[in-house]
Amino acid sequence: MHPRGKNVRIIDQKYNQGTAAARNVMVANATGEYLFIMDSDDVISPDCIDILYQKMKQYSVDFIAGSFQRQTWDGDIYPGGYRYKDTLIKDGDYAVAEYRYGQGHEIFVATWNKLYKVQFLRNNNIRCIDGYMIDDVWFTYQVIMCARSCCLVSDCTLFYTYNPNSVTSVRYSQKLSEQYVGTLSLKSEWIHGLRNKSFYNGLMYDILKMSVYHSYCIGNSEFVSPVDKQKLLSNLLSRKFPYPSHWYFNKFLFKALPFLLFYSFPMSIKIWVIRFIVSINLKDKVKRWFHF
């Protein structure tokens, strides 16, 4: 029992089922109007919840996202983090998806440091994938695609503790590689019904870019066997979504075109290209091009 039992409820899952299962339990069992997610090793500012809550009361959007700063275990500021410009997005269906994939503005991928309307998450059946260690990517993708409104806040409301041994900091294992592949497959399935949208080019570009990035990282991993690398690369380098029903000439089309051309090659050539890039150690250049 927590000392503040009337205000704090502890849900015991009996054994460690991972962060994805824990977050799904939170969504299912939340009794309030809003849900805030944070990791146990991070620190929120003293006014974090008040800032996000006041914005929610002012604008009544599907979610509020605060800015954050990275720090070390000792509390020293570490390079990175993200600071939004104060922005209100409130234009109806796919408003947030248009902002992210049509206009190309960033909405940070982490589930944490966001205040969600619980009913929004439940109405759209937004959940993490049980068993996945990289649960943020799919959860936030659903949020962006389903949200009709959101507010981005310039105030720094969370300090993210950089952990060199965290899931996102270590090299690609077999399990992590399979989860990245699975997440991209889910994204490809999701966008099938959006072929006529003007932001579809951005959706294609996002999937293609990240597929090539993960192909490189898997190809460069010493923890994935050659046989499994072949299977994973074949999956990642197969286009699983349709072409748009209308080709909108915008910046994302021109960004996607080199990837679409690459994906038109025979699989053996695509895999050879990835292996060649790995062999000449272009890791630093790839990391400079692609951020996630």
Provide a role label for each language-model segment.
Residues 10-30, 40:
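Glycine-rich, basic loop-to-helix element that forms the pyrophosphate-binding segment
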Residues 221-292:
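Membrane-interface aromatic/basic loop that binds lipid-linked glycans or pyrophosphate carriers
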